[in-house]
Amino acid sequence: MAYRDQPLGELALSIPRASALFRKYDMDYCCGGKQTLARAAARKELDVEVIEAELAKLAEQPIEKDWRSAPLAEIIDHIIVRYHDRHREQLPELILQATKVERVHADKPSVPKGLTKYLTMLHEELSSHMMKEEQILFPMIKQGMGSQAMGPISVMESEHDEAGELLEVIKHTTNNVTPPPEACTTWKAMYNGINELIDDLMDHISLENNVLFPRALAGE
Protein backbone atom coordinates (compact mmCIF):
# COMPACT_ATOMS: atom_id res chain seq x y z
CA MET A 1 0.00 0.00 0.00
CA ALA A 2 1.23 3.50 -0.82
CA TYR A 3 1.51 5.63 2.29
CA ARG A 4 3.40 8.57 0.81
CA ASP A 5 0.31 10.71 0.15
CA GLN A 6 -1.15 10.23 3.62
CA PRO A 7 -0.61 12.74 6.46
CA LEU A 8 1.94 11.76 9.11
CA GLY A 9 -0.57 12.34 11.90
CA GLU A 10 -3.04 9.92 10.33
CA LEU A 11 -0.36 7.26 9.84
CA ALA A 12 0.84 7.65 13.44
CA LEU A 13 -2.68 6.95 14.67
CA SER A 14 -3.61 4.13 12.29
CA ILE A 15 -0.42 2.03 12.23
CA PRO A 16 1.01 0.43 15.42
CA ARG A 17 4.36 1.95 16.43
CA ALA A 18 4.46 4.26 13.41
CA SER A 19 5.09 7.12 15.83
CA ALA A 20 8.27 5.39 17.07
CA LEU A 21 9.38 4.95 13.45
CA PHE A 22 8.81 8.65 12.76
CA ARG A 23 10.77 9.52 15.90
CA LYS A 24 13.66 7.40 14.64
CA TYR A 25 13.74 9.45 11.45
CA ASP A 26 13.13 12.73 13.34
CA MET A 27 9.87 13.35 11.46
CA ASP A 28 7.33 15.61 13.18
CA TYR A 29 4.00 13.76 13.29
CA CYS A 30 2.40 15.89 16.01
CA CYS A 31 2.68 19.63 15.25
CA GLY A 32 3.60 18.75 11.65
CA GLY A 33 1.04 15.96 11.42
CA LYS A 34 -0.80 17.43 8.44
CA GLN A 35 2.20 17.09 6.09
CA THR A 36 2.27 14.00 3.89
CA LEU A 37 4.84 11.26 4.35
CA ALA A 38 6.35 12.15 0.96
CA ARG A 39 6.82 15.80 1.93
CA ALA A 40 8.24 14.95 5.36
CA ALA A 41 10.69 12.46 3.83
CA ALA A 42 11.77 14.95 1.17
CA ARG A 43 12.44 17.61 3.80
CA LYS A 44 14.73 15.19 5.65
CA GLU A 45 16.25 13.85 2.39
CA LEU A 46 15.04 10.34 3.21
CA ASP A 47 14.03 7.51 0.86
CA VAL A 48 10.24 7.41 1.10
CA GLU A 49 10.12 3.86 -0.33
CA VAL A 50 12.23 2.54 2.55
CA ILE A 51 9.91 4.18 5.09
CA GLU A 52 6.82 2.88 3.27
CA ALA A 53 8.24 -0.66 3.45
CA GLU A 54 8.82 -0.29 7.20
CA LEU A 55 5.28 1.05 7.67
CA ALA A 56 3.87 -1.90 5.70
CA LYS A 57 5.54 -4.31 8.14
CA LEU A 58 4.20 -2.41 11.13
CA ALA A 59 0.70 -2.33 9.60
CA GLU A 60 0.53 -6.15 9.80
CA GLN A 61 0.22 -5.86 13.60
CA PRO A 62 -3.17 -5.21 15.23
CA ILE A 63 -3.62 -1.72 16.63
CA GLU A 64 -4.22 -1.62 20.41
CA LYS A 65 -6.78 1.19 20.40
CA ASP A 66 -8.10 3.27 17.52
CA TRP A 67 -8.65 6.65 19.14
CA ARG A 68 -10.00 8.08 15.87
CA SER A 69 -13.38 6.49 16.59
CA ALA A 70 -13.45 6.68 20.41
CA PRO A 71 -15.96 8.99 22.16
CA LEU A 72 -14.50 12.46 22.78
CA ALA A 73 -15.09 12.21 26.54
CA GLU A 74 -13.10 8.97 26.63
CA ILE A 75 -10.25 10.59 24.67
CA ILE A 76 -10.16 13.52 27.11
CA ASP A 77 -10.10 11.25 30.17
CA HIS A 78 -7.30 9.23 28.56
CA ILE A 79 -5.27 12.37 27.77
CA ILE A 80 -5.50 13.60 31.37
CA VAL A 81 -4.54 10.27 32.99
CA ARG A 82 -2.01 9.03 30.42
CA TYR A 83 -0.31 12.32 29.49
CA HIS A 84 -1.15 15.28 31.75
CA ASP A 85 -0.63 13.39 35.00
CA ARG A 86 2.50 11.73 33.59
CA HIS A 87 4.09 15.02 32.47
CA ARG A 88 3.48 16.42 35.95
CA GLU A 89 5.58 13.55 37.33
CA GLN A 90 8.24 13.52 34.60
CA LEU A 91 9.35 17.13 34.44
CA PRO A 92 10.12 17.89 38.12
CA GLU A 93 12.28 14.74 38.29
CA LEU A 94 14.10 15.60 35.05
CA ILE A 95 14.75 19.14 36.30
CA LEU A 96 16.32 17.76 39.51
CA GLN A 97 18.53 15.41 37.49
CA ALA A 98 19.56 18.15 35.05
CA THR A 99 20.46 20.48 37.92
CA LYS A 100 22.71 17.79 39.41
CA VAL A 101 24.36 16.85 36.10
CA GLU A 102 25.05 20.47 35.14
CA ARG A 103 26.54 21.16 38.58
CA VAL A 104 28.65 18.02 39.03
CA HIS A 105 29.93 17.89 35.44
CA ALA A 106 30.26 21.63 34.82
CA ASP A 107 33.89 21.24 33.73
CA LYS A 108 33.15 18.66 31.01
CA PRO A 109 32.79 19.92 27.40
CA SER A 110 29.95 17.44 26.82
CA VAL A 111 27.76 18.73 29.67
CA PRO A 112 24.32 19.82 28.39
CA LYS A 113 24.61 23.48 29.37
CA GLY A 114 21.26 25.20 29.77
CA LEU A 115 19.26 21.96 29.94
CA THR A 116 17.86 22.77 33.39
CA LYS A 117 16.64 26.13 32.09
CA TYR A 118 14.94 24.62 29.03
CA LEU A 119 13.28 21.84 31.02
CA THR A 120 12.03 24.41 33.53
CA MET A 121 10.61 26.52 30.69
CA LEU A 122 8.85 23.45 29.28
CA HIS A 123 7.50 22.56 32.72
CA GLU A 124 6.09 26.05 33.25
CA GLU A 125 4.57 26.22 29.77
CA LEU A 126 3.00 22.76 29.98
CA SER A 127 1.66 23.31 33.50
CA SER A 128 -0.20 26.43 32.36
CA HIS A 129 -1.28 24.79 29.10
CA MET A 130 -2.68 21.64 30.72
CA MET A 131 -4.53 23.64 33.37
CA LYS A 132 -6.25 25.72 30.66
CA GLU A 133 -7.26 22.57 28.82
CA GLU A 134 -8.62 20.90 31.95
CA GLN A 135 -10.47 23.96 33.26
CA ILE A 136 -11.73 25.55 30.04
CA LEU A 137 -11.41 23.60 26.79
CA PHE A 138 -12.06 20.03 27.86
CA PRO A 139 -15.28 20.88 29.76
CA MET A 140 -16.53 22.78 26.67
CA ILE A 141 -15.92 19.74 24.48
CA LYS A 142 -17.55 17.36 26.98
CA GLN A 143 -20.62 19.63 27.04
CA GLY A 144 -20.92 19.38 23.25
CA MET A 145 -19.68 22.95 22.68
CA GLY A 146 -16.54 21.99 20.76
CA SER A 147 -17.73 23.66 17.56
CA GLN A 148 -17.69 26.98 19.44
CA ALA A 149 -14.15 26.46 20.73
CA MET A 150 -12.18 27.70 17.71
CA GLY A 151 -10.49 30.42 19.82
CA PRO A 152 -9.30 28.20 22.69
CA ILE A 153 -8.26 25.44 20.27
CA SER A 154 -6.19 27.89 18.19
CA VAL A 155 -4.41 28.99 21.37
CA MET A 156 -3.76 25.38 22.40
CA GLU A 157 -2.36 24.51 18.96
CA SER A 158 -0.08 27.53 19.08
CA GLU A 159 1.16 26.43 22.50
CA HIS A 160 1.74 22.94 21.10
CA ASP A 161 4.00 24.51 18.47
CA GLU A 162 5.93 26.34 21.21
CA ALA A 163 6.37 23.10 23.16
CA GLY A 164 7.60 21.40 19.99
CA GLU A 165 10.16 24.16 19.47
CA LEU A 166 11.41 23.70 23.04
CA LEU A 167 11.78 19.96 22.42
CA GLU A 168 14.00 20.77 19.44
CA VAL A 169 16.16 23.02 21.65
CA ILE A 170 16.40 20.24 24.25
CA LYS A 171 17.40 17.71 21.57
CA HIS A 172 20.06 20.09 20.26
CA THR A 173 21.39 20.75 23.79
CA THR A 174 21.67 17.00 24.51
CA ASN A 175 23.24 15.89 21.20
CA ASN A 176 19.89 14.41 20.16
CA VAL A 177 19.51 12.95 23.67
CA THR A 178 22.65 10.82 23.30
CA PRO A 179 24.79 10.44 26.45
CA PRO A 180 28.57 10.76 25.99
CA PRO A 181 30.84 7.80 26.91
CA GLU A 182 31.76 9.42 30.24
CA ALA A 183 28.13 9.93 31.33
CA CYS A 184 27.36 8.87 34.91
CA THR A 185 24.31 6.85 35.94
CA THR A 186 22.21 9.95 36.68
CA TRP A 187 23.12 11.45 33.31
CA LYS A 188 22.10 8.26 31.45
CA ALA A 189 18.89 7.91 33.47
CA MET A 190 18.03 11.54 32.73
CA TYR A 191 18.47 11.03 28.98
CA ASN A 192 16.28 7.90 29.13
CA GLY A 193 13.66 10.01 30.89
CA ILE A 194 13.95 12.81 28.32
CA ASN A 195 13.45 10.34 25.47
CA GLU A 196 10.37 8.99 27.24
CA LEU A 197 9.07 12.53 27.76
CA ILE A 198 9.56 13.39 24.07
CA ASP A 199 7.73 10.21 22.98
CA ASP A 200 4.87 10.89 25.39
CA LEU A 201 4.57 14.57 24.54
CA MET A 202 4.59 13.96 20.79
CA ASP A 203 1.90 11.26 21.10
CA HIS A 204 -0.07 13.58 23.41
CA ILE A 205 0.04 16.51 20.98
CA SER A 206 -0.72 14.23 18.01
CA LEU A 207 -3.85 12.87 19.69
CA GLU A 208 -5.13 16.39 20.38
CA ASN A 209 -4.13 18.05 17.09
CA ASN A 210 -5.07 15.18 14.79
CA VAL A 211 -8.11 13.65 16.52
CA LEU A 212 -9.66 15.51 19.44
CA PHE A 213 -9.56 19.07 18.12
CA PRO A 214 -10.76 18.41 14.54
CA ARG A 215 -13.62 16.22 15.75
CA ALA A 216 -14.62 18.75 18.43
CA LEU A 217 -14.64 21.59 15.89
CA ALA A 218 -16.78 19.44 13.57
CA GLY A 219 -19.47 19.49 16.24
CA GLU A 220 -19.25 16.02 17.76
Swiss-Prot record:
Keyword terms, alphabetized: Cytoplasm, Iron, Metal-binding, Stress response
Traits of the deletion mutant: Mutants show a severe growth impairment under nitrosative and oxidative stress conditions. Mutation increases the sensitivity of the bacterium to iron starvation, increases the intracellular levels of free iron, and decreases the activity of several iron-sulfur-containing proteins.
One Gene Ontology MF term: iron ion binding
Keyword check for Cytoplasm: yes
Induction, per UniProt: Induced by nitric oxide. Negatively regulated by Fnr and Fur, but no obvious Fnr or Fur binding sites were found, suggesting that this regulation could be indirect.
Cellular component annotations (GO), alphabetically ordered: cytosol
Main location class: cytoplasm
GO BP annotations, alphabetical order: protein repair; response to nitrosative stress; response to oxidative stress
Short name of any one Pfam family annotated for the protein: ScdA_N
Protein localization: Cytoplasm
Origin superkingdom: Bacteria
Protein task: Di-iron-containing protein involved in the repair of iron-sulfur clusters damaged by oxidative and nitrosative stress conditions.
Similarity section: Belongs to the RIC family. YtfE subfamily.
Name under which the protein is recorded: Iron-sulfur cluster repair protein YtfE
Species this protein is from: Escherichia coli (strain K12)
Lineage: Bacteria, Pseudomonadati, Pseudomonadota, Gammaproteobacteria, Enterobacterales
Gene name of the record: ytfE
